[in-house]
């Protein structure tokens, strides 16, 4: 039986508009820097934190089912650490064999080395999970509160969004239609919003959009976002749960030229249903920009696997975690009435990439 050939996404060209012609993916969504060293440091930190907290997590009394899922997942990873060739941490077996004191000293050395640098949030994040895990699973503190302290979560998202340069993508789109109606899903701390808005300016500072709707499932982030983006006009802040029909939540069907989603669509129970809800919002010639986690490593699983939403995809073929590779996004987009993936750009070469930046548009007559 013949197997379907996986497309070489990096050489796909994207036609924005007749006046622009083809936009090569590597020009519109390119890595900002060589990140191999960063990714290896991050992987080493989370693996050491995972090993260090294994015993106390096993002894803790989990108060929620998703905490039990996390504990089972981490126990399985711990067994993999003992085998040679763990991704990005080839000496994981030696890290397991270290004494607790030596491992703790190595963890603190990494933390000290990145203080006051852009790497601080991605090294401090795993430490906070390790340091607070018993209080989290026994219900005395919430993970989100732990990660929000000192602006860590916002700085973490800024680091992740800074791995790839997508501002030219939004700028080219804005130049082809300076009256864009844009909706961002799950905008959260505004890391992607900031880069989109920076790109949606002409050379003389004119805004290249008519409206920008900043949405999130909760209004928790809205006050901070209003302060962060007070210098921009025509931004509206609204609550939206994209796992539900958006029209029933007061949004207009077929109204948006561009929908932006950064690491949010995976956190829903059924991706095809969610993508159908996204398609409902788009104009027939509109675009979805979907930035999604696609890392070979398990850093993100370690960081946010204690959140209930991380395990929502059990019945959707995502029992081991919510993230899927671009080939699978392509298939599910087609099932939801899109043409599939129009283009994909990664923020680094394998196996050191973190995000996949994906563009899709509605299928005609779907």
UniProtKB/Swiss-Prot annotation:
It comes from the Eukaryota. Keywords: Methyltransferase, S-adenosyl-L-methionine, Transferase. Gene3D superfamilies: Vaccinia Virus protein VP39. Pfam families: Methyltransf_12 (PF08242). CDD domains: AdoMet_MTases. The keyword Methyltransferase applies. Induction: Expression is induced in complex medium (Czapek yeast autolysate medium) supporting calbistrin production. Its EC number is 2.1.1.-. GO terms for molecular function: methyltransferase activity. Pathway: Secondary metabolite biosynthesis. Calbistrin A has been reported to possess a number of interesting bioactivities including antifungal active against Candida albicans and cytotoxic toward both healthy and leukemic human cells. GO terms for biological process: biosynthetic process; methylation. It is an enzyme of class 2 (transferase). S-adenosyl-L-methionine binds at residues 189, 216, 245-246. Methyltransferase; part of the gene cluster that mediates the biosynthesis of calbistrin A and related compounds. Calbistrin A is a secondary metabolite with an interesting structure that was recently found to have bioactivity against leukemia cells. It consists of two polyketides linked by an ester bond: a bicyclic decalin containing polyketide and a linear 12 carbon dioic acid structure. The polyketide synthase calA is probably responsible for forming the decalin moiety. Belongs to the class I-like SAM-binding methyltransferase superfamily. This is Methyltransferase calH. The gene is calH.
